[in-house]
């Protein structure tokens, strides 16, 4: 019985898994609900289900250097073990490595000395859980303040360095339903507008410079029928315009007037959205990428249909939901500027090139069961001040290296022969042998050649269908074949390259099979003529039957001549230009 085929998502993740590793991994004993990265400094906020907020600082350069040095040492030890036969193959996968070469913090509340990461301060900021926390994005106070909200229905503004609360606002009195709660916080990038989305689909707007007054500045009622999943500012359009996601629709709202447009029902939950990196850099708010609960990312354009419906979709992981999406923010790299990061419920990170419409890189945030589920689902993504990706679930947080993939490209020749593919070595035991690798590679090359229509004409290898067409054309011109001149018989082998000689041999091999079929048809006609002659004797029929094969054999020899076929090809009589260089 054949082996059960693995899911496409698993195979794709293993094939596209990047060699980039984290520089630090922080584990949280209590569920992690929200994170935020400082826009200009290596400062990290983390809000927990207990209502605590931690403000941490990390030395990114030292962490990068430490993980790179340790990885090189482990790589050398692994190569030595492979040469001595202690291990079957060299592992190139980051997620399947038994040893971690990056810094691992087992408890975020108890960080050991010398870890190159410290907690600046921690506090019990909210009585319930901390739902959302963000840094101040205004240009004149960039990153100086933080805003947080919890299930206690209080928004608090605090200083980033000290953690001291500067002002707060109680928002429960502005709910349309007393059982409502805040799900999301977003601040305008140009105006003191602090937006909060609720579980009932409302958007409440406060003045971040005057929160102590507890006055509601704007209110958009029922932007969606269900909980607000995401709010995205549109600074290129107006400081009053925002995009919101809720349930199965996308809405374009003006916080002064209400809903401008609302999309068609997508029949799938819309979870997160972002602008592409080039649109963020060029201050454009036209192309929007939206993540779905069914494992896809859709592309929307305001200029095409006013965001009424999706234009195209990219399949990411049909086995999981895409819970978070964020632009790379790196406009210095041509590949990165067209890409966005997204995290799914299976603990995988995917980099999508939205212009190519496919996943181009995969990283594994969590491959094992977590404390709060089968896997640590990637529910939060952020980008730090130096374009490093930050991924987080409820159990752990990882800051990924921003170095390019260089380690896997520096492979030794001695190792590449025995371990060409980590995937093959993990899937079966036979893939450790060189013979099986060669056989698999040859099989793959044959399959690729079968599916590439131009491969034969470029390499000079003809398939059986082309041979049949050439011979059929030569049979239709039977008189020309029989009148082959002596000069054509005397073509020297030096006039043709070795590749063309291989073509001739293949055609000679197929010519008798085709010519036999034509001879069989002629033989039937001759037998019918012979049966009509009743006066002939059996003794006279026998030599005729013996003479016919002799004549037919001569015709076979004439048809086996490849010079006619070569001449026809050189004159392009078949429309195939294969010997233009001769």
UniProtKB/Swiss-Prot annotation:
- Show the segment(s) annotated as Disordered: 405-496, 531-582
Q: What is this protein called?
A: WD repeat-containing protein JIP5
Key words of the record: Nucleus, Repeat, WD repeat
Which cell locations does it reside in?
Nucleus, Nucleolus
Where are the WD-type repeats located?
Answer: 27-68, 125-168, 177-216, 265-310, 373-410
Question: Which cysteine pairs are joined by S-S bonds?
Answer: none
SUPFAM superfamilies with a match to the protein in the record: WD40 repeat-like
Bias class Acidic residues marks the residues at 410-438, 447-485
Q: Which organism is it from?
A: Debaryomyces hansenii (strain ATCC 36239 / CBS 767 / BCRC 21394 / JCM 1990 / NBRC 0083 / IGC 2968) (Yeast)
Q: Please state which protein family the record places this protein in.
A: Belongs to the WD repeat WDR55 family.
Q: Where is the composition biased (Basic and acidic residues)?
A: 531-540, 570-582
Q: Which GO terms describe its cellular component?
A: nucleolus
Q: Could you tell me which InterPro entries the record lists for this protein?
A: WD40/YVTN_repeat-like_dom_sf, WD40_repeat_dom_sf
Q: Which GO terms describe its biological process?
A: ribosomal large subunit biogenesis
- KW Repeat (keyword) present: yes
Major place of residence? nucleus
Asked if the Swiss-Prot or TrEMBL record annotates the protein with the keyword DNA repair, the reply is no
């Amino acid at each position: 019985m054949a082996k059960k085929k693995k899911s496409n998502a698993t195979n794709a993740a293993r094939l596209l898994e990047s060699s980039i590793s984290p520089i630090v991994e922080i584990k949280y004993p209590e569920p992690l609900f929200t994170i935020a990265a400082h826009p200009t400094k290596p400062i990290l906020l983390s809000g927990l289900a207990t209502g605590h907020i931690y403000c941490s600082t990390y030395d990114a350069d030292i962490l990068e250097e430490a993980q790179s040095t340790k990885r090189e040492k482990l790589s050398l030890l692994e190569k030595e073990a492979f040469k001595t036969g202690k291990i079957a193959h060299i592992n190139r996968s980051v997620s399947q490595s038994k040893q971690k070469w990056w810094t691992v913090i087992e408890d975020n509340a108890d960080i050991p000395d010398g870890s190159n990461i410290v907690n600046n301060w921690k506090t019990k900021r909210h009585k319930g859980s901390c739902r959302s926390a963000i840094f101040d994005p205004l240009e004149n106070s960039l990153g100086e303040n933080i805003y947080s909200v919890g299930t206690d229905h209080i928004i608090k503004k605090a200083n980033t360095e000290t953690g001291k609360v500067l002002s707060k606002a109680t928002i429960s009195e502005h709910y349309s339903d007393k059982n409502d709660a805040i799900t999301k916080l977003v601040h305008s990038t140009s105006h003191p507008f602090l937006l909060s989305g609720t579980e009932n689909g409302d958007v409440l707007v406060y003045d971040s410079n005057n929160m102590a007054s507890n006055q509601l500045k704007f209110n958009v009622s029922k932007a969606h029928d269900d909980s607000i999943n995401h709010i995205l500012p549109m600074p290129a359009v107006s400081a009053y315009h925002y995009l919101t996601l809720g349930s199965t629709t996308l809405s374009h709202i003006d916080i002064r007037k209400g809903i401008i447009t609302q999309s068609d029902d997508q029949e799938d939950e819309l979870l997160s959205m972002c602008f592409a990196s080039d649109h963020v850099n060029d201050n454009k708010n036209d192309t929007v990428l939206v993540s779905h609960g069914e494992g896809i990312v859709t592309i929307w354009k305001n200029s095409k249909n006013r965001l009424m419906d999706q234009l195209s979709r990219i399949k990411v992981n049909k086995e999981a939901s895409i819970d978070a999406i964020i632009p790379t923010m790196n406009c210095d790299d041509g590949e990165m500027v067209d890409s966005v990061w997204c995290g799914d419920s299976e603990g995988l990170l995917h980099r999508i090139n939205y212009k190519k419409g496919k996943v181009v890189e995969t990283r594994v945030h969590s491959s094992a069961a977590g404390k709060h589920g089968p896997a640590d689902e990637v529910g939060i993504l952020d980008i730090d001040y130096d374009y490093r990706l930050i991924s987080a679930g409820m159990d752990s947080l990882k800051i990924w290296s921003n170095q390019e993939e260089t380690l896997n490209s520096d492979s030794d020749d001695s190792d590449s022969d025995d371990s060409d593919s980590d995937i093959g070595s993990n899937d079966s035991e036979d893939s450790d042998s060189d013979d099986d690798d060669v056989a698999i590679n040859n099989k793959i090359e044959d399959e690729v050649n079968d599916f590439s229509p131009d491969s034969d004409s470029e390499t000079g290898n003809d398939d059986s269908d082309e041979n049949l067409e050439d011979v059929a054309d030569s049979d239709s011109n039977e008189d020309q074949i029989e009148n082959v001149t002596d000069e054509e018989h005397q073509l020297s082998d030096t006039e043709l390259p070795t590749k063309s000689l291989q073509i001739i041999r293949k055609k000679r091999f197929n010519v008798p099979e085709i010519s036999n079929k034509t001879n069989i048809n002629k033989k039937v006609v001759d037998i019918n003529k012979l049966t009509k002659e009743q006066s002939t004797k059996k003794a006279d029929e026998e030599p005729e039957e013996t003479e016919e094969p002799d004549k037919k054999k001569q015709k076979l020899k004439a048809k086996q001549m490849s010079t006619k076929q070569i001449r026809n090809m050189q004159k392009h009589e078949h429309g195939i230009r294969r010997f233009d260089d001769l």
